């Protein structure tokens, strides 16, 4: 029986990992053993941060809404409570977008919310 070697398969696997490690510093972009560790860690960070990004953007939207609402003499928590009472269902992403790009529209929403405080 002849010996079976995995030449093509392992070469392709090495090539795939080294391609993912392109741009890494030191031996991490040329040495397979180091590269595989760095690529695995990078993929772990990417997985974690895809979830953290959602958290970070929600915090950013809240900060923007709070800053815009304070210009009109309210606080974020009061404003959100008033929106609930006024039955205005606009999510934080849209509110933050309005606060930054359409201050007149946002001011009218604040006036509607103030009526329900």
UniProtKB/Swiss-Prot annotation:
The gene is rplT. HAMAP family: Ribosomal_bL20 (MF_00382). It comes from the Bacteria. SUPFAM superfamilies: Ribosomal protein L20. The keyword Electron transport does not apply. Pfam families: Ribosomal_L20 (PF00453). One of its GO terms (molecular function) is rRNA binding. It comes from Rickettsia felis (strain ATCC VR-1525 / URRWXCal2). InterPro entries: Ribosomal_bL20, RIBOSOMAL_L20_CS, Ribosomal_protein_bL20_C. Keywords: Ribonucleoprotein, Ribosomal protein, RNA-binding, rRNA-binding. Coiled coil: none annotated. GO terms for biological process: ribosomal large subunit assembly; translation. This is Large ribosomal subunit protein bL20.
